[in-house]
A protein has these predicted regions:
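Alpha-helical transmembrane segments of multi-pass inner-membrane proteins
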Residues: 2-3, 8-35, 44-46, 50-90, ...
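C-terminal luminal/periplasmic domains and tails of membrane-associated envelope-modifying transferases
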Residues: 2-6, 564-752
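Short, hydrophobic transmembrane alpha-helix segments
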Residues: 88-106, 126-132, 289
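Non-cytosolic membrane-interface motifs at loop->transmembrane helix junctions
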Residues: 101-102, 163-173
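Interfacial juxtamembrane loops and adjacent helix segments
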Residues: 221-263, 368-389, 393-401, 409-446, ...
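Hydrophobic alpha-helical transmembrane segments in integral membrane proteins
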Residues: 360-369, 534-575, 596-600
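Flexible interhelical linker loops that connect adjacent transmembrane helices
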Residues: 522-536
Length: 752
C-alpha cells in the first residue's frame, strides 16, 4: 500500500529496522522532536545508512537506510558515471574485439546495458524491500517529451533513425529513454548530501582520466619545438624531434593535430564533457574541508581547465564563460570558506590557462592559434562561422516545412541536402554533408518539432530556476552543500550554452540528466511502498524483458566489429574482396538499422559484380541480381539518405559503362536509363547535392543527352569551383562534343 511521506525528518523502513536503529542510538544522538518553523527547516538527524547525513535545508531528503539491492543500484549508477566518459575501444591490436567506431558506439553500449541494470535493480529493490518512490510534477513533462518524441518517431522520414539515432551520434528516442531512466533513478537514490558528494567525486575522478589523456595528446605541440631547439643548439642535432605521448595508434585525424580529443574522438565532443569536469570539480574544491582532498581537487581542476583550452573548441569557451559568471555570482552570495592554499591554486588555474594560450600564439593555424580562434567567434562572414549560419538557415527551412512533429530525432543529415543553400558547397565543399545543426535548439525543433523543443527547454528551466534560488540564499551551517550545488548548477548552464553551438551525444548528455536529477531532489516528495509477496516472479519477468534490448545492444556492438573487419581486409585481391563482403553482410545481418553498413555491402558487391561482368564470368547474372537486391534494401531502409542514392548510382552507371565498353548497347542503355530515371527526382529534391548531380550527368551522357549533361556539369562547377571531378568530366565531354562536331563537318567533304 502506498503512503505519502508526511514529514521531512521521518524515517521509513520496516518496524524491525527502525527499532534496531533506535536501540543503537545513544541518548546524545537521539533526534529531537521536530519543530515547525516558518522557513520549514528541521533539525539535523543521523542514520546508520550510507550517506546518512541529512541536509534538511535543501529539501525533503531521504533518511531511509538503503537495502543491499539499493546499495547495488546506487553504486551501479556511480559506476556508470565513472565508466561512460572513459569508455572507448582500446583493443586496436586485437582483431577479435576491435570496432570501427572506437568512441560513441562503445559509450552508447555501456549506457544501454547500464541503464537496464539500473532500472531492473531499482524495481527489485522496491518490490522486495518496499520504500520510497520520490516524485515531482516534472515527471509529467518528461513523460510528455517522450510521448511526443514517440509520435515524431512514428511519423518520421526514417523511424529507425529517429529511434536508434544516426551512426556515431545516437541521439534518437532510445537515448532519451535512457536519460529518463537515469533521471528517475538518480532522484530515488542520490538523496543525501554524502551521496551527492560521492556522485560529484566519482565524476571528478573520471574527468581526471579523460582530461589527462587529452593533455598527453596536446603536450607534443610544445615539447617537440622545445626539444628540437635544444637538440639543435646544444647537441648539434639536425633532425627534428617528434614525440608522441599518445600510445594508441590513431591514423589520420579529421581535425588539426595536437588538439585534445581524449576518449571522445573529437575535440568538440570532448568539450561538452569538460563542462561537467570543470564545474563539478570546482564545487568539490570549495566544499572540501580536508586539506589533502582539496589539493587533489585543485589539481584535477587545473588539468580540466587546461584541456578546455587545448581542445580548441569555441563552444565550451562560450559555455564555460557563462557558467563561470553564474558560479562567481552565486559564490559571492555564499561567501565560501577560503584556505591559504586556494589562492595559489586559483592563480595556478589562471596561469595554466594563460600559458597554454600563449604557447599557441606562434602557430600559423587559425584553429590552433588561441587568439585567432577566439577572434573567429566574432567573424560571421568567413570560416566555420559562415558554414554554421548556412546550416542554421537550412535548419530553419526544415522547421518551417514540418513545424509540429519535425522530421524525426537525429534525422537532420537525411534532410539537410533538401534545404542546404547553394553557397554551402562553396564554403564547405561539395562532399560535406551536415549531419548536425550545431545548435541544439534548432536541432531539436527540426527533429521533434517546435513543441518537443519547448518541452525539452521547459524541463531545463524547471530545474535551473529553483536551483538558482536555492543557491542564492546564503547559509553558513550548510555551506559545503551549497558549493556542490553551485558547481552542479554551473555545469548544467555551461553545457546547455555549449549545446547552442555544439552537438549533443549520449556520452556527455547522460550527465546532464543525472545532474538535473540531483538538482531537483530537494523539491521532490515521497510515497512509501510496502514490499510485495510476488517479488520473485515479477523480478524474473523484469529480467527477461530487459534481456531483449540488452541482446540487441550486444548484437549492434558485434555488427560494428564486422563493419571494421570489412574495411580492414580491403579489396586488393579476389579473396580479400570476398572476405570483406562476408564481413559486411554479417554487419548488416546483426544490425539492419544502419545505412552505412548496407552501403558498404553495396559498394563491395558493385566492385565484385563489375569485375565479373568485365570478365564475362558465369556468376555475373547472379551477382547483378544480388547487388540490385542489396540496393533495394538500402534505399528502403532510408529513402531520404543522400549517400544511398550515390552508392546506387555508382553501380548503375558503372554497369552502363562496363556494358558500353563490351559493345552491349542494349544493356548499357538499360542501366543508363535506370540511373537517369531514379536520380532525376532526387536531383529535384536535393538540387545542391553536387556529387549526385555528377552521377546524373554521367547517366545523361550515356543516354546521348550531351547538352543536358553539360548543363548539369556546369551547375556542379559553379556550385563548387574546387570540384575537380566535375571539371574534368566537363572538359572531357566538351572535347568529345568537339570531336563529334568536327567529324560531322568533315563527313560531306569525304563523300564528294
Amino acid at each position: 500500500m502506498a503512503k505519502k511521506k508526511k514529514s521531512k525528518s521521518k524515517q521509513h523502513g520496516s518496524p524491525a529496522q527502525v527499532s534496531a536503529q533506535k536501540q543503537a542510538e545513544s541518548p546524545e544522538q537521539a533526534p529531537k522532536p521536530e519543530r515547525k518553523t516558518s522557513d520549514k527547516k528541521s533539525a539535523r538527524a543521523t542514520s546508520s545508512a550510507h550517506g546518512s547525513e541529512f541536509a534538511p535545508e535543501i529539501g525533503d531528503f531521504s533518511m531511509r537506510e538503503m537495502s543491499a539491492e539499493g546499495r547495488f543500484t546506487f553504486y551501479a549508477l556511480l559506476t556508470l558515471v565513472f565508466l561512460v566518459p572513459i569508455a572507448m575501444n582500446f583493443f586496436f591490436t586485437n582483431q577479435g574485439m576491435v570496432t570501427y567506431d572506437a568512441f560513441d558506439t562503445i559509450k552508447v553500449w555501456v549506457l544501454r546495458i547500464g541503464s537496464l541494470v539500473l532500472l531492473v535493480s531499482w524495481l527489485i529493490d522496491l518490490l522486495k524491500n518496499g520504500g520510497e518512490i520520490r516524485y515531482h510534477k516534472i515527471y509529467l513533462l518528461v513523460a510528455f517529451l517522450l510521448i511526443w518524441m514517440g509520435i515524431s518517431t512514428v511519423v518520421s522520414v526514417s523511424p529507425l533513425t529517429a529511434f536508434f539515432g544516426k551512426y556515431k551520434r545516437y541521439d534518437g528516442l532510445w537515448s532519451y529513454l535512457i536519460y529518463a531512466i537515469l533521471f528517475f533513478v538518480t532522484i530515488q537514490y542520490v538523496t543525501t548530501y554524502e551521496r551527492i558528494k560521492l556522485f560529484a567525486r566519482t565524476l571528478s575522478l573520471s574527468s581526471l582520466f579523460v582530461a589527462f589523456y587529452g593533455l598527453l595528446q596536446w603536450l607534443p605541440s610544445i615539447l617537440n619545438p622545445a626539444f628540437t631547439f635544444i637538440g639543435k643548439h646544444v647537441f648539434n642535432l639536425k633532425s627534428a624531434v617528434h614525440l608522441n605521448l599518445d600510445l594508441l595508434p590513431w591514423g589520420k585525424l579529421p581535425f588539426e593535430q595536437y588538439r585534445s580529443f581524449s576518449t571522445y574522438g573529437n575535440p568538440d565532443l570532448l568539450a561538452g564533457f569538460l563542462a561537467f569536469g570543470v564545474f563539478v570539480t570546482l564545487g568539490l574544491v570549495l566544499s572540501e574541508e580536508r586539506r589533502s582532498w582539496r589539493v587533489f581537487y585543485w589539481i584535477v581542476l587545473i588539468i580540466n581547465g587546461m584541456v578546455m583550452i587545448t581542445a580548441k573548441s569555441r563552444s565550451i569557451w562560450v559555455g564555460g564563460a557563462v557558467g563561470l559568471i553564474l558560479a562567481v555570482i552565486l559564490l559571492v552570495k555564499q561567501k565560501p570558506r577560503w584556505m591559504k592554499l586556494d589562492y595559489g591554486f586559483a592563480g595556478g588555474v589562471g596561469l595554466g590557462a594563460i600559458l597554454v594560450a600563449l604557447t599557441s600564439l606562434g602557430s600559423k593555424s587559425v584553429v590552433m592559434n588561441f587568439w585567432s580562434r577566439v577572434t573567429s567567434i566574432f567573424q560571421f562572414n568567413s570560416g566555420s562561422a559562415l558554414t554554421r549560419f548556412q546550416i542554421w538557415g537550412a535548419a530553419v527551412r526544415a522547421i518551417k516545412a514540418r513545424p509540429i512533429f519535425g522530421w524525426g530525432s537525429d534525422t537532420f543529415r537525411l534532410v539537410f541536402r533538401r534545404f542546404e543553400p547553394f553557397a554551402y558547397n562553396q564554403s564547405a565543399g561539395y562532399q560535406n554533408v551536415a549531419d548536425n545543426v550545431h545548435n541544439f535548439l534548432l536541432q531539436l525543433a527540426a527533429g521533434i518539432g517546435i513543441v518537443g523543443m519547448l518541452a525539452f527547454y521547459a524541463i531545463m528551466f524547471w530545474v535551473i530556476v529553483p536551483a538558482v534560488k536555492l543557491c542564492v540564499s546564503p547559509d553558513e551551517e550548510h555551506k559545503g552543500e551549497r558549493m556542490i550545488f553551485i558547481g552542479l548548477l554551473a555545469a548544467v548552464v555551461a553545457y546547455n550554452v555549449h549545446l547552442f553551438f555544439g552537438i549533443s551525444i549520449p556520452g556527455a548528455s547522460f550527465l546532464l540528466w543525472i545532474v538535473l536529477g540531483v538538482l531537483i531532489v530537494p523539491r521532490t516528495k515521497a510515497v512509501v511502498i510496502d514490499p510485495v509477496p510476488w517479488v520473485v516472479p515479477a523480478s524474473a519477468a523484469a529480467i527477461m524483458i530487459a534481456l531483449v534490448p540488452a541482446a540487441f545492444s550486444c548484437r549492434f556492438l558485434a555488427a560494428d566489429h564486422h563493419y571494421y573487419l570489412a574495411s580492414a581486409y580491403g579489396t586488393d585481391s579476389a579473396s580479400a574482396l570476398q572476405t570483406s563482403l562476408a564481413e559486411a553482410q554479417a554487419a548488416c545481418k546483426l544490425n539492419p538499422t544502419i545505412e552505412i553498413y548496407r552501403a558498404q555491402e553495396v559498394s563491395l558487391l558493385t566492385q565484385k559484380t563489375l569485375s565479373a561482368v568485365q570478365q564475362k564470368a558465369k556468376n555475373a547474372g547472379a551477382l547483378t541480381e544480388q547487388t540490385e537486391q542489396s540496393i533495394t534494401a538500402m534505399l528502403n531502409l532510408s529513402p531520404y539518405e543522400y549517400d544511398s542514392y550515390l552508392y546506387a548510382s555508382f553501380f548503375w552507371n558503372g554497369m552502363g559503362q562496363q556494358y558500353q565498353s563490351l559493345g552491349d548497347t542494349k544493356q548499357a542503355s538499360y542501366y543508363f536509363d535506370k540511373a537517369a530515371n531514379r536520380l532525376s527526382p532526387q536531383i529535384k529534391a536535393m538540387p545542391n547535392g553536387l556529387a549526385l548531380r555528377l552521377q546524373y550527368a554521367q547517366a545523361l551522357q550515356g543516354q546521348g543527352k550531351i547538352d543536358e549533361a553539360l548543363r548539369q556539369l556546369r551547375y556542379c562547377i559553379k556550385g563548387d569551383p574546387k570540384f575537380t571531378e566535375a571539371k574534368q568530366a566537363y572538359d572531357a565531354l566538351i572535347k568529345v562534343q568537339s570531336q563529334e562536331a568536327s567529324a560531322a563537318a568533315a563527313t560531306p567533304a569525304v563523300k564528294k
